[in-house]
């Protein structure tokens, strides 16, 4: 005899059979479909988590590398600036050395020229004294030839040369 379920004419046996089949299907789905499906989902979740972690590590490493590169660039700029400053200082020092050497050489040339001028002046004065003495002797010998002896003439000339030498 069929029982009615909520006023519908569905036999109880069919309902029990359908419920039994449904329960078997649920058990089979749980064992063969849900288990592996949940395992795959779990693996996928772990894979995605691992990928996210790897991406975060890569991102952190990239940020670290960028920071290191910035620091290296900053350090390179500082070193370049120091190198430029050292080169400028070296150039100034070298300029000072060259200028000092040039001044020293100029002073040496000037001193040498002054000595040369002094020597030539002394030579010119000596030559002039000799010429004056020679001319004086000639003039004096003509003028005084009759009045002075030769010894007196020589003494007179020597005195005259001394006077000319002291006058300079």
From Swiss-Prot:
Q: Where is this protein localized, as stated in its record?
A: Cell membrane
Sequence intervals crossing the membrane: 9-29
Keywords of the record: ATP synthesis, Cell membrane, CF(0), Hydrogen ion transport, Ion transport, Membrane, Transmembrane, Transmembrane helix, Transport
Question: Has UniProt tagged this entry with the keyword Cell inner membrane?
Answer: no
* Disulfide bond residue pairs: none
Its predominant location is membrane
Give this protein's Gene Ontology molecular function annotations: proton-transporting ATP synthase activity, rotational mechanism; proton-transporting ATPase activity, rotational mechanism
Q: Which InterPro entries match?
A: ATP_synth_B-like_membr_sf, ATP_synth_b/b'su_bac/chlpt, ATP_synth_F0_bsu_bac, ATP_synthase_B_chain
Membrane topology recorded in Swiss-Prot or TrEMBL:
Single-pass membrane protein
Any one annotated GO CC term: plasma membrane
Question: Entry's Pfam families?
Answer: ATP-synt_B
Q: Which Gene3D superfamilies match?
A: 6.10.250.1580
Give the UniProt family note.
Belongs to the ATPase B chain family.
Give the quaternary structure.
Answer: F-type ATPases have 2 components, F(1) - the catalytic core - and F(0) - the membrane proton channel. F(1) has five subunits: alpha(3), beta(3), gamma(1), delta(1), epsilon(1). F(0) has three main subunits: a(1), b(2) and c(10-14). The alpha and beta chains form an alternating ring which encloses part of the gamma chain. F(1) is attached to F(0) by a central stalk formed by the gamma and epsilon chains, while a peripheral stalk is formed by the delta and b chains.
Role, per record: F(1)F(0) ATP synthase produces ATP from ADP in the presence of a proton or sodium gradient. F-type ATPases consist of two structural domains, F(1) containing the extramembraneous catalytic core and F(0) containing the membrane proton channel, linked together by a central stalk and a peripheral stalk. During catalysis, ATP synthesis in the catalytic domain of F(1) is coupled via a rotary mechanism of the central stalk subunits to proton translocation.
Name listed for the protein in its UniProt record: ATP synthase subunit b
């Amino acid at each position: 005899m069929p029982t009615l379920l909520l006023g519908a004419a569905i036999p109880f046996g069919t309902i029990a059979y359908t419920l039994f089949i449904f329960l078997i299907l649920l058990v089979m789905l749980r064992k063969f479909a849900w288990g592996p499906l949940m395992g795959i989902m779990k693996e996928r979740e772990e894979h995605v988590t691992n990928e996210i972690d790897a991406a975060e590590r890569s991102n952190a490493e990239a940020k670290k590398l960028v920071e290191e590169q910035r620091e290296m660039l900053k350090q390179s700029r500082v070193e370049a600036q120091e190198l430029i400053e050292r080169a400028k200082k070296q150039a100034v020092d070298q300029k000072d050395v060259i200028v000092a050497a040039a001044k020293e050489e100029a002073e040496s040339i000037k001193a040498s020229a002054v000595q040369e001028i002094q020597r030539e002046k002394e030579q010119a004065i000596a030559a002039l004294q000799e010429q004056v003495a020679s001319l004086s002797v000639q003039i004096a010998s003509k003028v005084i030839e009759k009045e002075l002896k030769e010894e007196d003439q020589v003494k007179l000339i020597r005195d005259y040369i001394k006077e000319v030498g002291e006058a300079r």
